[in-house]
Amino acid sequence: MPLEIDADAPLSKTERLMLSLGITEDDLDLNAEGKLSPAQLQQLKIDRENQTWQMYAVGFIAVSTAFNLITGSGRVSESFLNSPVILLVIALLATVHAARKRNELKVDIDAGLVKRLDGPVQAVVPQRWWTYAVVSNDIRFQVPRRTFKAFTFGERYTIYYVPRTMKVVGVEPLL
């Protein structure tokens, strides 16, 4: 059942974290058993679909650049850095990386398993504006910005994650 919040009451740490990840107490209960909830499984499938479209977009750039080079539409300049060849190489590498990430996420979805890690959470510094990460027991996890802001750094948490991609699916403070 969805988390219901009294608008006048302050949020507990658990409630803040659950809201930041879009999960419920039932999700956390299943995570504690080492399983993904149906809602978490659905979210991972949506993430994989988004990665698929990203891979197609980057692959299209690679194919377009290769076509331009083959047909002579794309002129190879004297400077390698100004050349479409460098764009082709970057696009191909990005496509391979996206395909690998997509396949890793499929392994996590098919397994449906969740691992847990108990320990103090620290912020990774410096943070870039487009990615946020935390470290617990020398293991780094990328998290959404809203989840990053929900942590109280230095305190102990249980982090639930899928093992292959290290994607965080649930977090709760240790009491």
Residue ranges of each PLM-predicted region?
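Short acidic/glycine-enriched loop/turn segments that link adjacent beta-strands
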Residues: 128-130, 165
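Short, acidic/hydrophobic/Gly-rich beta-strand patch recurrent on exposed beta strands
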Residues: 131-138
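Cytosolic juxtamembrane N-terminal segments of multi-pass membrane proteins
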Residues: 2-52
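Structural detector for short beta-strands of small beta-barrel domains
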Residues: 107-128, 158
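Cysteine-centric segments in proteins
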Residues: 20-34, 102-109, 148-153, 174-175
